[in-house]
Amino acid sequence: MRSLATLHQSPASCSRSAPVAPCPARRANSSRRVARQGPRARASSPVVETESEDVDITPQIDAFEELVRLAVEKDPSLATLAEQHLRSKSKSAAPVSPFAAPSPGSPSASSMLGPSLGALPNQNKPAWLRQRAPQGEIYSGLKDQLRGLKLATVCEEAQCPNIGECWNGELATATIMLLGDTCTRGCRFCAVNTARTPPPPDPNEPVNTATAVASWGVGYVVLTSVDRDDMPDGGSEHFAATVRTLKQLRPGILVECLTPDFKGDLDAVRHLARSGLDVYAHNVETVERLQKRVRDPRAGYMQTLDVLRAAKECGVYTKSSIMLGLGETDDEVIDTMLDLKAVGVDIFTLGQYLQPTPHHLPVTEFVTPEKFEYWRKFGQEEIGFRYVASGPMVRSSYKAGEFFLHSMIESDRAKARAAQEGAAGRVRPL
């Protein structure tokens, strides 16, 4: 299944070559390149200057707290709800030292990636990636409820490292995985089960999913699915039926659908995009050069862009995500951002790839929190995405990100309603 929520246990980052200088426009002779909208922005990667080899380790940046802070900064009325989210997190979060002590013989500081990580890739993870095993009464209760309704979650199937955070606290939520727990594809980064002919989907799944989600009392939910190349429409109608049922039970809930590519069937994409969902998410996963190495051969970079373009044409918010740590370069990350922006993507997330098992792709390197913060600012300020979430533990479906998107969407709709009411007030009857 194609999802950053399916990032597993392996390290990642950008290239360790020399700092990136402003780049020229992408290869002009690339005949299949997406048409650009506006000039191609470029910026140098941040350079960390050190006076000696004994450099301080970059402090951990808490992605959850940062995203909540940004939401309150944009809309101060969210302050009370923000406190509730942060209390929720503090009850379940494992204490992790904000500084990682370098080990003897660790690599020297990199001008691109900041200070030494203290460990080579595929050895001990840096401190900012260490988390306590999920536990707690709320966690266990949610797990039992999902089992009782025979619902699969990407949180478990993809071994998401944030499960202890999202399944705990006052606003516990999970990302439901539709169409079963077995994928017809075999991406080399993903831990979800695979089979050529999975069991048929449960016909009661749309109702069971909507019932469970409606009972949680959350205002924003993410639905995702495995790839089902064995189904004529790739599962688009099953997905759409779940959205329609959920909207009937909870009309005010905002629904994000993190989808497969439906084999490139754009009619299936449009069918789901028009089902009543609010955010259409489909992940590019990695840069163009690494697609064949990382994703199943039936997926593709240009196919992903076509899916996102078709969804955007239906008038919904669109979102995509990329994993770092697979051997990509800074130039390639920038090119990917530009391609996504060119097809209208509103929301972009970046997270650390974590290798789920020894049989999956190895991690090339761990990316520092400092570098992730650079990409967040670059994506919003230089590329122009509406919203960027970037951090080692950030995943496409992430509770803190949902909080920010909820506030952004509600704010947009409130402004649209006010504009309509203002226009109606200016119309005088004859």
From Swiss-Prot:
<dbReference type="InterPro" id="IPR006638">
    <property type="entry name" value="Elp3/MiaA/NifB-like_rSAM"/>
</dbReference>
<feature type="binding site">
    <location>
        <position position="397"/>
    </location>
    <ligand>
        <name>[4Fe-4S] cluster 1</name>
    </ligand>
</feature>
<keyword id="KW-0004">4Fe-4S</keyword>
<keyword id="KW-0479">Metal-binding</keyword>
<feature type="binding site">
    <location>
        <position position="166"/>
    </location>
    <ligand>
        <name>[4Fe-4S] cluster 1</name>
    </ligand>
</feature>
<dbReference type="InterPro" id="IPR027526">
    <property type="entry name" value="Lipoyl_synth_chlpt"/>
</dbReference>
<feature type="binding site">
    <location>
        <position position="190"/>
    </location>
    <ligand>
        <name>[4Fe-4S] cluster 2</name>
    </ligand>
</feature>
<dbReference type="InterPro" id="IPR003698">
    <property type="entry name" value="Lipoyl_synth"/>
</dbReference>
<dbReference type="Pfam" id="PF16881">
    <property type="entry name" value="LIAS_N"/>
</dbReference>
<feature type="binding site">
    <location>
        <position position="183"/>
    </location>
    <ligand>
        <name>[4Fe-4S] cluster 2</name>
    </ligand>
</feature>
<comment type="similarity">
    <text>Belongs to the radical SAM superfamily. Lipoyl synthase family.</text>
</comment>
<feature type="compositionally biased region" description="Low complexity">
    <location>
        <begin position="91"/>
        <end position="119"/>
    </location>
</feature>
<comment type="pathway">
    <text>Protein modification; protein lipoylation via endogenous pathway; protein N(6)-(lipoyl)lysine from octanoyl-[acyl-carrier-protein]: step 2/2.</text>
</comment>
<feature type="binding site">
    <location>
        <position position="155"/>
    </location>
    <ligand>
        <name>[4Fe-4S] cluster 1</name>
    </ligand>
</feature>
<feature type="region of interest" description="Disordered">
    <location>
        <begin position="1"/>
        <end position="55"/>
    </location>
</feature>
<feature type="compositionally biased region" description="Polar residues">
    <location>
        <begin position="1"/>
        <end position="16"/>
    </location>
</feature>
<feature type="binding site">
    <location>
        <position position="160"/>
    </location>
    <ligand>
        <name>[4Fe-4S] cluster 1</name>
    </ligand>
</feature>
<feature type="region of interest" description="Disordered">
    <location>
        <begin position="85"/>
        <end position="119"/>
    </location>
</feature>
<keyword id="KW-0411">Iron-sulfur</keyword>
<dbReference type="GO" id="GO:0046872">
    <property type="term" value="F:metal ion binding"/>
</dbReference>
<keyword id="KW-0809">Transit peptide</keyword>
<dbReference type="InterPro" id="IPR007197">
    <property type="entry name" value="rSAM"/>
</dbReference>
<keyword id="KW-0408">Iron</keyword>
<protein>
    <recommendedName>
        <fullName>Lipoyl synthase, chloroplastic</fullName>
        <ecNumber>2.8.1.8</ecNumber>
    </recommendedName>
</protein>
<dbReference type="GO" id="GO:0009507">
    <property type="term" value="C:chloroplast"/>
</dbReference>
<keyword id="KW-0934">Plastid</keyword>
<feature type="binding site">
    <location>
        <position position="187"/>
    </location>
    <ligand>
        <name>[4Fe-4S] cluster 2</name>
    </ligand>
</feature>
<keyword id="KW-0808">Transferase</keyword>
<feature type="domain" description="Radical SAM core">
    <location>
        <begin position="166"/>
        <end position="386"/>
    </location>
</feature>
<keyword id="KW-0949">S-adenosyl-L-methionine</keyword>
<feature type="transit peptide" description="Chloroplast">
    <location>
        <begin position="1"/>
        <end position="40"/>
    </location>
</feature>
<dbReference type="InterPro" id="IPR031691">
    <property type="entry name" value="LIAS_N"/>
</dbReference>
<dbReference type="GO" id="GO:0016992">
    <property type="term" value="F:lipoate synthase activity"/>
</dbReference>
<keyword id="KW-0150">Chloroplast</keyword>
<dbReference type="InterPro" id="IPR013785">
    <property type="entry name" value="Aldolase_TIM"/>
</dbReference>
<dbReference type="Pfam" id="PF04055">
    <property type="entry name" value="Radical_SAM"/>
</dbReference>
<dbReference type="GO" id="GO:0051539">
    <property type="term" value="F:4 iron, 4 sulfur cluster binding"/>
</dbReference>
